Regions:
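Aromatic-rich peripheral "rim/lid" segments of glycoside hydrolase catalytic domains that contact
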Residues: 314-389
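Bacterial N-terminal signal peptides
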Residues: 1-8
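Active-site region of glycoside hydrolase catalytic domains
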Residues: 142-280, 289-310, 338-344
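An active-site-proximal structural segment forming one wall of the substrate-binding cleft
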Residues: 60-82, 92, 96-128, 132-170, ...
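N-terminal carbohydrate-binding accessory modules
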Residues: 11-81
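Surface-exposed, active-site-proximal loop segments in enzymatic domains
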Residues: 55, 88-106, 129-144, 176-184, ...
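Solvent-exposed loop/turn segments at secondary-structure junctions
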Residues: 32-36, 81, 87-92, 128-132, ...
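Catalytic domains of carbohydrate-active enzymes, especially glycoside hydrolases
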Residues: 65-87, 290-298, 333-335, 339-342
Length: 389
């Protein structure tokens, strides 16, 4: 009886998903770290197991080992939440039970503990498990859902004693390889099945997981494939929860030619004279309003699990371009927070000029801030949004 009462008290202490998101001032992604493939392993492999060197996957893509100093630096810069993308498929000790290597799970727990030591919220997901992400087809649906249920049963049981600050996200960018475009009805149906499987199994593990903040995804984490035509089916949570403890996740690198590929150097109305992208503040706020109207109105939280700006500049305009990037960050964070969304900026520790240069902190140089314009804009956005609270 005492155990039951204690469990109920723990569950009652859990905030809703919308409360959880509203408490995130600014979130950061520990990118290109724990979602790496094992050293020497094909990153697109669907193999499940423990290949040689799997315990060293954390550094397989060139980034140094994460330390408590890594987390401390992120917290000191003003972030109070971290998303930890995790690839599990090369750390499975028993593929039939989808059991996770004790070494790998211990390492993930260690990093979570560091985050909690600094009173940061955490998202843990399944990221780059290619057997799951790259096969959104009916021929794989039943097998994948069974494996996903076993995997999340193991993760949820291992992490179930953590308090409300730790949230679970079911999948990542599920898509047919080399096809980021419009999905088929089959692709969408499989993504919806993944989401329901994830919700069912996490709740079934009981304890804190009954009302833990759980995060489900639109296909390829592109909200356009969930906002229209009933493409996204809101999973059914257990009785008594409604939609209160669930968020929908999307990723936002818009407009891509500015945020992702770096072909366009300016964004926003104040920079129109320099050839700014056609997509602007009105585009962004209109899109955010659609998210709030479609999902927020139904009680769901909204998590922008990834967003960012690749560093790109030209000649003598570098300072003005970086000033413009600060303006974008300020606008993005302020508008998202006004609507209660949580946001997690992507940082892959890559620096340079052009596509995929999303580095903010230099992990190879004691977490020195290399993209100060990003931090500046994010902080200004947080301050701006506070005026509307």
């Amino acid at each position: 009886m005492l155990t039951l009462m204690f469990t109920l008290l723990l569950c009652q202490a859990q905030p809703t998903a919308r409360q959880w998101n509203s408490e995130v001032t600014a979130g950061w992604n520990l990118g290109n770290q724990f979602e790496c493939s094992a050293p020497g392993q094909d990153g697109e492999s669907i193999d499940i197991g423990e290949p040689d060197g799997a315990d060293n996957a954390e550094t397989a893509w060139g980034n140094p080992v994460v330390t408590k100093r890594t987390i401390k630096a992120v917290r000191a810069a003003g972030f109070n939440a971290i998303r930890i993308p995790v690839r599990w498929q090369c750390h499975v000790s028993n593929p039939y039970a989808m059991s996770i290597s004790k070494v790998w799970m211990g390492r993930i727990k260690e990093v979570i503990d560091w985050c909690l030591d600094y009173d940061m919220k955490v998202i843990v997901n399944v990221h780059h498990d290619k057997w799951l992400e790259s096969r959104p087809h009916y021929e794989n649906k039943e097998e994948n859902c069974q494996k996903l249920a076993l995997l999340w049963m193991n993760i949820a049981n291992e992490l179930g004693t953590y308090d409300y600050r730790v949230a679970f996200a079911g999948t990542n960018e599920v898509h047919v390889p080399d096809n980021w475009g419009k999905p088929t009805a089959e692709n969408l149906d499989v993504q919806n099945a993944y989401n329901q499987t994830f919700v069912d199994i996490v709740r079934a593990t009981g304890g804190n997981n009954i009302k833990r903040h759980i995060i489900v995804q639109t296909y390829v984490c592109n909200a356009d494939y969930g906002l229209y035509n009933g493409d996204f089916a809101i999973p059914t949570d257990i009785n008594g929860n409604g939609n209160d403890y669930m968020s929908v996740e999307l990723h936002y690198y818009n407009p891509w030619e500015y945020a992702g590929s770096g072909e366009c150097y300016y964004w926003g109305e104040p920079y129109k004279q320099y050839g700014a992208a056609q997509s602007d503040e009105t585009t962004m706020t209109g899109f955010f309003d659609r998210l709030a109207n479609e999902w927020g109105s139904k009680g769901l939280g909204i998590v922008i699990g990834e967003w960012g700006l690749t560093d790109h500049y030209k000649g003598e305009e570098a300072d003005r371009i970086h000033e413009n990037m600060s303006y974008y960050c300020k606008t993005f964070v302020a508008e998202a927070r006004k609507r209660g969304f949580s946001t997690f900026v992507w940082d892959n520790n890559r620096f340079g000029n052009g596509e995929d240069m999303f580095g903010i902190f230099d992990r190879n140089k004691n977490m020195a801030i290399k993209s100060g314009w990003m931090i500046k804009g994010i902080k200004e956005g947080v301050a701006e949004s506070a005026k509307f609270k």
